[in-house]
C-alpha cells in the first residue's frame, strides 16, 4: 500500500500567508489539516492522494467570522456548510450579549429567537433536547464532542449571565442586582474565560426584544445593566486580556463615549474592544467620519485597543409585510412590534389616527437610528400583484393618489408576508465603504451568519471583500492590496 507524505498537495497557486506581504507562487503540502510544507518548487504528484493545480488562483488561510449568530444552528447542524463553502474556517458565536451557556433552555431561546429572527418553534425544541449543560465547562465539553465543520469560538453573553443569576423577569426589569448577584456574575465570567471563551459580549441598544410569554417585547437583559455592573465585569476582561464586544445605543449614540473611556490604556492595560458598527448609513451620512475619528481618539490619544466592526458589502435587507425590526427605533413602530397577535397588528395600521402618528415619527429628524425611513427607497421584490415588482412605495402611491406610507400599509394589509420588499440601510457609496475597510480602527465583521435568515445573507463576506479589492485595483483606484485584503479576513481578526 502506497505511503503518502501529505494528505493534500496544492501546486502553482499564488500563496498569501495572511500577513500583508504580497503573494507569490508557492506549493503547499497539507497533513492532518495543517500546512506542513511551503515549497518554492512543485511537490510531486505521488506525494498525496489529492493533488490540485491552483494555477491562476489565490491560495489563502481560512477566513474568520468574528460576529455570527450560529448559536442554535451549530447545535443542530455542526457542519455549518454555508460558511465553510465560502472559505470560512473559524467562527465566533455568543455575539450581542446572547450565548447559550448558563441560562435555562427556554431562557436561551427567548433571548435569541426574536432578536435574531429565527423561529422559536425551531430553536426551543433543539435546546430542550440538546442543552444538558448549565455552565461554561459543560458547554465546552459539548462542542469538544461535536463533528464541527469550522473551528468554533465563543463569547459569553452578558444577557445570558444576567438571566442565569437574576432570572429572566428580574433581569429584564429596573431591579438592581445584589452584591451577591454581582459576585456571581463575576464568577460566571471567570468560568467562561477559564473554559476558553474569548471574552464577553454586551448590548446597550434597546431595539432588540425578548421572545416568549414571560418577558415578551422587553429589551434584552444587558440593556438594563448600570455602568457599575459593566465596570466590574470589564475589570475582569482587562485583567484576563479578553475581548469586550459591545453595541452602543443605536438611536441616541452618545454612550459610545463611555465605551471609549472604558477602553483606554492610560496607566493601565487597555481593554480589547470590538464595537458595532462602522457603516456608511443613509440615515446619517457623516457617521462614518465620526466612527473613524472615535477610533483614532481611542487608540492614539487614549492608548486603547478599540476597533469598529464593518461590513464589506451594501447593508441591504429583505423584508416581509410589517415584519420590520427598524420600527423599534420610534414609538409608534415599537407599538406595532409589541403586538404578538398578527391580526391585531395588521388591524392597527388600518386606524387613521395610528397612521397619522406613524407618519409623524417617520419624519422626525432626531430619532433616526439605522434606518433612513424613506419609503421611496423601499422596493417591492415579490408580490401577488406582479405589476408592483421593481417599484418603490412612493411610485406605487403616486399612481393611486396616496402618500408612500399609506401605499405601503395598504399593500401590507392586503398581502401580509406575501409582500416582500427590500431597502438599503447603508454602505451604498463604494468610496466611503473602501475608507471604512482600509481604516486601521476597523475590522471586518458584522456578517450575522445564522441570523435574520429571511432578510440578509452575508456568508460570503470575505470573498466580497477580496472582489472589491481586486475590482478597485483593476479600476486604478486601489484602497488596499490583495495581501492586505487577505490579512483583513484572516490574521488581523485572529
Question: What does each model-identified segment do?
Answer:
Residues 2-8, 15-62:
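Histidine-rich, glycine-flanked metal-binding segment
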Residues 13, 33, 56, 67, ...:
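Divalent metal-coordination and catalytic microenvironments
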Residues 41, 96-98, 205, 449:
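Short, ordered loop/turn segments at secondary-structure junctions
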Residues 58-80:
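Di-metal (Zn2+ and/or Mg2+/Mn2+) metal-binding site signature of metallo-dependent hydrolases
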Residues 76-186, 191, 195-199, 239:
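Divalent-metal coordination cores built from histidine and acidic residues
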Residues 139-143, 149-151, 155-168, 173-181, ...:
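Active-site neighborhoods of metal-dependent hydrolases
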Residues 212-215:
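Active-site His/acidic residue clusters
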Residues 464, 477-492:
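C-terminal amphipathic alpha-helical interaction region
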Amino acid at each position: 500500500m502506497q505511503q503518502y507524505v501529505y494528505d493534500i498537495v496544492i501546486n502553482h497557486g499564488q500563496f498569501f500567508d495572511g500577513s500583508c506581504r504580497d503573494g507569490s507562487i508557492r506549493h503547499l503540502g497539507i497533513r492532518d489539516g495543517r500546512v506542513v510544507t511551503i515549497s518554492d518548487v512543485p511537490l510531486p504528484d505521488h506525494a498525496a492522494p489529492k493533488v490540485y493545480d491552483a494555477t491562476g488562483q489565490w491560495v489563502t488561510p481560512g477566513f474568520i467570522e468574528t460576529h455570527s449568530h450560529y448559536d442554535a444552528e451549530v447545535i443542530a447542524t455542526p457542519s455549518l456548510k454555508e460558511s465553510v463553502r465560502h472559505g470560512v474556517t473559524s467562527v465566533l458565536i455568543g455575539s450581542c450579549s446572547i450565548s447559550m451557556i448558563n441560562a435555562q433552555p427556554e431562557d436561551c431561546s427567548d433571548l435569541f429567537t426574536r432578536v435574531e429572527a429565527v423561529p422559536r418553534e425551531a430553536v426551543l425544541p433543539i435546546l430542550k433536547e440538546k442543552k444538558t449543560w448549565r455552565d461554561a465547562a459543560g458547554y465546552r465539553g459539548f462542542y469538544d464532542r461535536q463533528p464541527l465543520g469550522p473551528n468554533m469560538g465563543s463569547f459569553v453573553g452578558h444577557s445570558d449571565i444576567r438571566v442565569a443569576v437574576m432570572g429572566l423577569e428580574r433581569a429584564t426589569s429596573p431591579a438592581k442586582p445584589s452584591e451577591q448577584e454581582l459576585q456571581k456574575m463575576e464568577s460566571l465570567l471567570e468560568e467562561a474565560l477559564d473554559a476558553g471563551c474569548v471574552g464577553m459580549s454586551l448590548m446597550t441598544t434597546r431595539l432588540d426584544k425578548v421572545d416568549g410569554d414571560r418577558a415578551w417585547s422587553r429589551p434584552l437583559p444587558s440593556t438594563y445593566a448600570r455602568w457599575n455592573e459593566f465596570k466590574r465585569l470589564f475589570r475582569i476582561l482587562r485583567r484576563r486580556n479578553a475581548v469586550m464586544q459591545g453595541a452602543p445605543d443605536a438611536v441616541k449614540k452618545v454612550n459610545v463615549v463611555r465605551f471609549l473611556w472604558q477602553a483606554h490604556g492610560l496607566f493601565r492595560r487597555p481593554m480589547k474592544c470590538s464595537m458595532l458598527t462602522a457603516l456608511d448609513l443613509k440615515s446619517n451620512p457623516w457617521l462614518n467620519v465620526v466612527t473613524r475619528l472615535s477610533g483614532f481618539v481611542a487608540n492614539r490619544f487614549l492608548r486603547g485597543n478599540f476597533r469598529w466592526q464593518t461590513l464589506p458589502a451594501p447593508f441591504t435587507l429583505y423584508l416581509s409585510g410589517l415584519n420590520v425590526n427598524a420600527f423599534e427605533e420610534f414609538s409608534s413602530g415599537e407599538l406595532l412590534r409589541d403586538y404578538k397577535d398578527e391580526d391585531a397588528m395588521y388591524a392597527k395600521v388600518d386606524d387613521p389616527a395610528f397612521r397619522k402618528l406613524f407618519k409623524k415619527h417617520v419624519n422626525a429628524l432626531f430619532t433616526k437610528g439605522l434606518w433612513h425611513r424613506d419609503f421611496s427607497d423601499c422596493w417591492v421584490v415579490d408580490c401577488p400583484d406582479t405589476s408592483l415588482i421593481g417599484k418603490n412605495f412612493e411610485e406605487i402611491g403616486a399612481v393611486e393618489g396616496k402618500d408612500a406610507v399609506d401605499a405601503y400599509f395598504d399593500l401590507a394589509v392586503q398581502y401580509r408576508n406575501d409582500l416582500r420588499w427590500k431597502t438599503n440601510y447603508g454602505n451604498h457609496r463604494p468610496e466611503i465603504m473602501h475608507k471604512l475597510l482600509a481604516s486601521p480602527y476597523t475590522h471586518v465583521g458584522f456578517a450575522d451568519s445564522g441570523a435574520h435568515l429571511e432578510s440578509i445573507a452575508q456568508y460570503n463576506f470575505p470573498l466580497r471583500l477580496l472582489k472589491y479589492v481586486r475590482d478597485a485595483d483593476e479600476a486604478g483606484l486601489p484602497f488596499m492590496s490583495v495581501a492586505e485584503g487577505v490579512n483583513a479576513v484572516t490574521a488581523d481578526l485572529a
